[in-house]
């Protein structure tokens, strides 16, 4: 991809502080060798997540001043609903404080609806790949999360356009194995974060929806990075090069019945989420009832009016093709620099992050010693860069057996916040990892000193294995 400059001017800056290695060693020990627990002031470049860490535009900042903080019926809520209907095509909208808020009010209602119809005796959700909080909400509601992403996603070296696709044969086999009556929902994750921020093709989304309709299974589109997915469809899928991003998005959402969204990603707000419905007004009403005690009144869902206004504006800004070309190009630039330096990554790069294959880079560290987390710590010590593990540590234990779930990949995610860092930062990141590669065999595995029972990677404490 041709490297292009940022399609924006910088109006405000935030100073960041470089620390020395001695300071970082002390900070990492205090954090229990878990970068999630590091204070942000001890981090030079923060690649932990792209969720809520982007820079808002001048229009979004102006929108904050238009906040209507009425408890009920805020005008910003109605603006948000109008934007969702116009841009996504769904007429029923519930705002939430973030994506997991949408999941916590939706999933119990989906299970209850299935059980009311006589099904879901052994409830399961099927996805191309559940992300961590999504799987946690499934399991906390007594259901099982099953991933059926294409096997091509697990060959990080080989190029394939659609490493976020469902394995359609495996999807059909899973429905047959558990019985359609037990499948509460199919969750289409766009883009597929856990396989490397990889896109799912329109043809795959269409076929998944056709299979779901055959079995009367509702489809939820997990929509955190829907704009990036639409950009990949425009670039790679035959028949879409002449369509606008907005046209592609409207078609994508015809292959779902409802959506959950962490609006902290593509819509570029610091807080916010959505739970929206295409036709099922009865389910919408059930979820709204649950929203009130869990998230807040139905016209604010845990958000201030000003935050809903920024979200309504950001929904459209995130669809800007020039911005998406720059944004995904920056991720690709970092990926190509790393590949040129001999760092194994999930190839091709996805939309929001570069995923380093720690299993290849650190073959001496077994999965049960969390190689990607070990690399995460080493990168922080090397250069003050915080990233995040996507592998065995994140995947966790089977809630029924207590055994570690086998992770097909051990990835270190270098997540690029939107409109925050320049390509000079990307060069610094690449130089640090390439330098670290020459000493990779010195990196040691990790073991727990404290392991939480749910979503352990957030607050676990570890120590190096000597």
UniProtKB/Swiss-Prot annotation:
<dbReference type="InterPro" id="IPR015424">
    <property type="entry name" value="PyrdxlP-dep_Trfase"/>
</dbReference>
<keyword id="KW-0823">Tryptophan catabolism</keyword>
<dbReference type="InterPro" id="IPR018176">
    <property type="entry name" value="Tryptophanase_CS"/>
</dbReference>
<comment type="pathway">
    <text>Amino-acid degradation; L-tryptophan degradation via pyruvate pathway; indole and pyruvate from L-tryptophan: step 1/1.</text>
</comment>
<dbReference type="InterPro" id="IPR013440">
    <property type="entry name" value="TNase"/>
</dbReference>
<dbReference type="Pfam" id="PF01212">
    <property type="entry name" value="Beta_elim_lyase"/>
</dbReference>
<comment type="similarity">
    <text>Belongs to the beta-eliminating lyase family.</text>
</comment>
<comment type="subunit">
    <text>Homotetramer.</text>
</comment>
<feature type="modified residue" description="N6-(pyridoxal phosphate)lysine">
    <location>
        <position position="265"/>
    </location>
</feature>
<keyword id="KW-0456">Lyase</keyword>
<keyword id="KW-0663">Pyridoxal phosphate</keyword>
<dbReference type="InterPro" id="IPR015421">
    <property type="entry name" value="PyrdxlP-dep_Trfase_major"/>
</dbReference>
<dbReference type="InterPro" id="IPR001597">
    <property type="entry name" value="ArAA_b-elim_lyase/Thr_aldolase"/>
</dbReference>
<protein>
    <recommendedName>
        <fullName>Tryptophanase</fullName>
        <ecNumber>4.1.99.1</ecNumber>
    </recommendedName>
</protein>
<dbReference type="InterPro" id="IPR015422">
    <property type="entry name" value="PyrdxlP-dep_Trfase_small"/>
</dbReference>
<dbReference type="GO" id="GO:0009034">
    <property type="term" value="F:tryptophanase activity"/>
</dbReference>
<dbReference type="InterPro" id="IPR011166">
    <property type="entry name" value="Beta-eliminating_lyase"/>
</dbReference>
């Amino acid at each position: 991809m041709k490297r292009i400059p940022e399609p924006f001017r910088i109006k405000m800056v935030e100073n960041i502080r470089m620390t020395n290695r001695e300071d970082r060693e002390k900070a990492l020990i205090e954090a229990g060798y878990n970068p999630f627990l590091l204070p942000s002031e001890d981090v030079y470049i923060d690649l932990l997540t792209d969720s809520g860490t982007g820079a808002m535009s001048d229009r979004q900042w102006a929108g904050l001043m238009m906040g209507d903080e009425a408890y009920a019926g805020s005008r910003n809520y109605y603006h948000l609903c109008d934007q969702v209907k116009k841009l996504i095509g769904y007429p029923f909208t519930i705002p939430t404080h973030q994506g997991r808020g949408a999941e916590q009010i939706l999933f119990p209602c989906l299970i209850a609806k299935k059980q009311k119809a006589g099904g879901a005796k052994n409830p399961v959700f099927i996805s191309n790949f559940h992300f961590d909080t999504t799987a946690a909400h499934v399991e906390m509601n007594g259901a099982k999360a099953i991933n059926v992403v294409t096997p091509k996603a697990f060959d990080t070296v080989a190029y394939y356009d659609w490493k976020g696709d469902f394995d359609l044969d495996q999807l059909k086999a899973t429905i047959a194995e558990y019985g359609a009556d037990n499948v509460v929902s199919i969750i289409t994750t766009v883009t597929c974060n856990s396989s490397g921020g990889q896109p799912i093709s329109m043809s795959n989304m269409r076929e998944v929806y056709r299979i779901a309709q055959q079995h009367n299974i509702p489809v939820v589109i997990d929509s955190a990075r829907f704009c990036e997915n639409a950009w990949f469809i425009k670039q790679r899928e035959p028949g879409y090069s002449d369509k606008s991003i907005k046209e592609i998005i409207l078609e994508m959402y015809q292959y779902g019945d409802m959506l959950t969204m962490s609006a902290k990603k593509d819509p570029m707000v610091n807080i916010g989420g959505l739970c929206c419905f295409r036709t099922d007004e009865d389910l919408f009403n059930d979820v709204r009832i649950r929203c009130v005690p869990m998230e807040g009144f139905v016209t604010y869902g845990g958000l201030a009016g000003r935050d809903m206004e920024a979200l309504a504006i950001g929904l459209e800004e995130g669809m800007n093709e020039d911005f998406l070309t720059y944004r995904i190009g920056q991720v690709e630039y970092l990926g190509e620099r790393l590949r040129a330096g001999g760092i194994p990554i999930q190839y091709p790069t996805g939309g929001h992050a570069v995923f380093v294959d720690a299993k290849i880079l650190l073959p001496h560290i077994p999965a049960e010693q969390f190689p990607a987390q070990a690399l995460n710590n080493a990168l922080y010590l090397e250069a003050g860069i915080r990233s995040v593990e996507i592998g065995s540590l994140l995947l966790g234990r089977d809630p029924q057996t207590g055994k570690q779930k086998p992770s097909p990949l051990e990835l270190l995610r270098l997540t690029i916040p939107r409109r925050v860092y320049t390509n000079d930062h990307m060069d610094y990141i690449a130089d640090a990892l390439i330098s670290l590669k020459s000493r990779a065999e010195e990196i040691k595995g990790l073991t727990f000193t404290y392991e939480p029972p749910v979503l352990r990677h957030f607050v676990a404490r570890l120590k190096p294995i000597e």
